[in-house]
Design a protein with these regions (language model features):
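N-terminal loops that bind phosphate or other acidic moieties
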Residues: 1-81
Length: 81
């Protein structure tokens, strides 16, 4: 995401130091957002969509992708039996 269109800061844990500092920055600046709970599907979504989505769209799609990537494989396999 180009700085002219916005900045997305990703942090690992909500409430951790990186998240808290990023949030303070985002609250003071225009077109800066922070998401936490980063996982690999979220990063892949970010890299593939950062040139085609607005900052708000990117935040929403990254969060949705991260949540969709959380699974319990054993439960899924047991349900398929």
């Amino acid at each position: 995401l180009d700085q002219e269109e916005g900045v997305l800061i990703m942090a690992d844990l909500f409430g951790g130091t990186p998240s808290n500092l990023a949030t303070k920055i985002a609250l003071r600046k225009e077109n800066v957002e922070t998401v936490t709970g980063v996982n690999l599907p979220m990063i892949i979504q970010f890299v593939t969509e950062r040139e085609t989505q607005t900052l708000d769209e990117l935040v929403e799609s990254c969060i949705e992708t991260a949540q969709d990537g959380i699974k319990c494989p054993t439960k899924i396999m047991k349900e398929r039996r």
